[in-house]
């Protein structure tokens, strides 16, 4: 039986990565979530990070939020451009799965294209990954 999981190389795991994406990337708001999006240096590799504070609710609510965001990303990640995404809840309401799918399909490409159009220099923490599983590197 094949498990549909999100592989480790498709996740944002380290604090340094989260800081880089939030500082160097652009942000946009979906229906119930906030996306921080930064272009990826690796073609064909889209990464996801999720942050949920304790203000959102108890552990079972936070875990459910993370679970549905991961599943929506897993369904849409092959149609997304190469980028790094950090997702945060906008308020204390649980988002609907269908809304998340729609937000991933519409908001992420728009935020990434606006970031590339502005083309402003990045400041702050630079992140250089060592052990990535993405094959080709963008110039």
UniProtKB/Swiss-Prot annotation:
GO MF, one term, reads:
tRNA binding
Biological process terms from the Gene Ontology for this record are: tRNA 5'-leader removal
What InterPro entries does the record point to? Ribosomal_Su5_D2-typ_SF, Ribsml_uS5_D2-typ_fold_subgr, RNase_P, RNase_P_CS
Q: Which GO terms describe its cellular component?
A: ribonuclease P complex
Q: Enumerate the residue ranges of region (Disordered).
A: 120-139
Q: Which reaction does it catalyse?
A: Endonucleolytic cleavage of RNA, removing 5'-extranucleotides from tRNA precursor
Gene3D superfamilies recorded: 3.30.230.10
Give the Basic and acidic residues compositional bias ranges.
Answer: 129-139
Catalytic activity, EC: 3.1.26.5
**Top-rank lineage group of the source organism:** Bacteria
Please provide the record's keywords in A-Z order: Endonuclease, Hydrolase, Nuclease, RNA-binding, tRNA processing
SUPFAM superfamilies the UniProt entry points to: Ribosomal protein S5 domain 2-like (SSF54211)
Q: What does this protein do?
A: RNaseP catalyzes the removal of the 5'-leader sequence from pre-tRNA to produce the mature 5'-terminus. It can also cleave other RNA substrates such as 4.5S RNA. The protein component plays an auxiliary but essential role in vivo by binding to the 5'-leader sequence and broadening the substrate specificity of the ribozyme.
**What does the record note on quaternary structure?**
Consists of a catalytic RNA component (M1 or rnpB) and a protein subunit.
What family is this? Answer: Belongs to the RnpA family.
User: What name goes with this protein?
Assistant: Ribonuclease P protein component
């Amino acid at each position: 039986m094949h498990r549909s999981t999100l592989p480790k190389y498709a996740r944002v795991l380290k604090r340094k990565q989260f800081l880089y994406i939030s500082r160097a990337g652009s942000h946009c708001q979906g229906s119930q979530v906030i996306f921080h999006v930064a272009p990826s240096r690796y073609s064909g590799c889209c990464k996801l990070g999720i942050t949920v504070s304790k203000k959102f609710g108890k552990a079972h609510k936070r875990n459910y939020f993370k679970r549905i965001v991961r599943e929506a990303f897993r369904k849409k990640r092959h149609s997304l451009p190469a980028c790094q995404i950090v997702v945060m809840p906008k308020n204390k309401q649980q988002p609907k799965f269908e809304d998340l799918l729609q937000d991933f399909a519409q908001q992420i490409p728009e935020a990434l294209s606006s970031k590339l159009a502005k083309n402003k220099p990045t400041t702050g923490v630079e992140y250089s990954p060592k052990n990535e599983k993405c094959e080709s590197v963008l110039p």
